[in-house]
Amino acid sequence: MSCGLNDVNVSTISLQMALWRPNESKVYLPPTPVSKVISTDVYVTRTNVYYHGGSSRLLTVGHPYYSIKKSNNKVAVPKVSGYQYRVFHVKLPDPNKFGLPDADLYDPDTQRLLWACVGVEVGRGQPLGVGVSGHPYYNRLDDTENAHTPDTADDGRENISMDYKQTQLFILGCKPPIGEHWSKGTTCNGSSAAGDCPPLQFTNTTIEDGDMVETGFGALDFATLQSNKSDVPLDICTNTCKYPDYLKMAAEPYGDSMFFSLRREQMFTRHFFNLGGKMGDTIPDELYIKSTSVPTPGSHVYTSTPSGSMVSSEQQLFNKPYWLRRAQGHNNGMCWGNRVFLTVVDTTRSTNVSLCATEASDTNYKATNFKEYLRHMEEYDLQFIFQLCKITLTPEIMAYIHNMDPQLLEDWNFGVPPPPSASLQDTYRYLQSQAITCQKPTPPKTPTDPYASLTFWDVDLSESFSMDLDQFPLGRKFLLQRGAMPTVSRKRAAVSGTTPPTSKRKRVRR
C-alpha cells in the first residue's frame, strides 16, 4: 500500500506474530494426607471426682561411684549417685474396677474410665550439698592456666577431684522419657586402622533409673569413646551420660512421654587442663611459627573441669506443688495404661558421706588402722492428684485408639477380632509324636508389661488412693487453689422410697 505525504486519512498498522511459551512457574502438588492427631480433650470427658495418691518415704543408699560386687559377681552395694536419673514407674489402680461413690457415673457397656493427672509434688529430703567426684589416675598433663615446661613422661596422670554441673529437672508422662547421647558409629567399608578417631553416631535410648546425667563432659558413651578410662571421673568413665531429648519428646505425635517438664541447669569452668597422649590430629603448620627451644608443640587437646557453683534453697524446683492445666502435647495428662512415669534429677542434694571403721586399735594414730568408706543417700516423697475421666467408645474413637495403642482396647476388653479366614486349618492331635512332621513352635505370649525389660523404680499406688483430699498436704493445697472448703464428714446418699407422713397432734386449749 502506497500513500503520499499529503494523504491525511492514513494510519500505520504494526502486526506482531504471537509466540507461545510454556508456563515456567512451578506447580506444587499437595502433600500426601496423613492421619490427624487430635487432643484428648476432644474425646475424653472429665468428671468432678478427684483422688489423692501418694507414696511412702522412698529411700535408697549406695556407693556414689560404682557398685560393689561379691566374689560370686553378685551386687552387694549398688551404685547410688546424686548424678543419676530417678525414673519412677507409678502404677495406678484400674478405675473400671474401682468402688466409685456414684454408680451412675458412667455406662460400662459403652464407656470406660481412666485417670488424668492434674497435680504433682516431688518431695525431697536430706540437706543441700555438693557431691564431689574424681579419678585417682585422671589424665591431667598440664595446668594450662599456670604454664610450665611440658611433662614428657609416659604417664602424667594425677589424682584430681571436682564437682559437676548443677541440674534440677523432672519430667512427667505416661511413657518413659527419651534420652540422647553420642555413641561409636561404624566406618564405611571397614576403612579404619588402630588409633583412628572413632566415628560418632547420634543415638536415642530410653532413660532408665540409674542412668547417669550429663555432668559437664558431654552426653557420650564413655565406655566406647574413651578407651584410656582416665579422661573423666570414676563414676562415668565406663558409663553413658544421657541428656533428655526435649526436641523429640516435644514433637511426639501423641505427647505421651512428656506432659510437661521443668529444668534448671548451671555450670562454670573451674580448672583448665590439657590431656596427655599422642596427638591424633596435628596442628596445621600455617597456624603457628615453629620454636627453636620447643620444636614439638605440646598437647592441644584442652579440657576443663566443670563446677555447679553454690546451691541455695531459693532456687529449688522441688517440695512445691505443680498443677497441670494444659500439657505441651496432644495428651493433656491422660494416664494411658494406668501408669505414670516421673523422672527426677536433683544434684543439689548430692552429698557423699564418709564412714570410718577401725580395723586395728593402737594408742597412736596410724592411717592404716582405719578403713574409709563412701556412701550416698537419697530420700523422696511423691504425691499426686488424679481426676476421674470417662471416654465413650464409639467406632471412630475405637479405631483411633487402636491405631494409637491396641493394648488399651485389650485391657478394656474391647479387642478387635481378627479377619475371617476361609481356608481350612490342619490340627494334629499328638503334637509330640515322632510319627508326624515337626510342628511350628508356639509363638511366645506377649508380655502384659511392655517395660518389663527396662529398669525403673516401681511405686505401686493401687492401695493408696483416697477421696479425702483434705487429709493430705497436696490435697489441701489443691482444695485451696480451687476455693473449695475442707469436708468435715461425708454426705450420705438419700434413702430411696416413700415414708408415710407423720400426723401432727393438735393442741387443745382448755
UniProtKB/Swiss-Prot annotation:
Q: Which family does it belong to?
A: Belongs to the papillomaviridae L1 protein family.
MF terms per GO, please?
Answer: structural molecule activity
Organism, as annotated: Human papillomavirus type 2a
Q: What is this protein called?
A: Major capsid protein L1
Give the multimer and partner information.
Self-assembles into homopentamers. The capsid has an icosahedral symmetry and consists of 72 capsomers, with each capsomer being a pentamer of L1. Interacts with the minor capsid protein L2; this interaction is necessary for viral genome encapsidation. Interacts with protein E2; this interaction enhances E2-dependent replication and transcription activation.
Fetch the SUPFAM superfamilies from UniProt. Answer: Group I dsDNA viruses
Per the record, GO CC terms? host cell nucleus; T=7 icosahedral viral capsid
**Keyword annotations of the record:** Capsid protein, Disulfide bond, Host nucleus, Host-virus interaction, Late protein, T=7 icosahedral capsid protein, Viral attachment to host cell, Viral penetration into host cytoplasm, Virion, Virus endocytosis by host, Virus entry into host cell
**A GO biological process this protein is involved in?**
virion attachment to host cell
Q: Where in the cell is it found?
A: Virion; Host nucleus
Write down the superkingdom of origin. Viruses
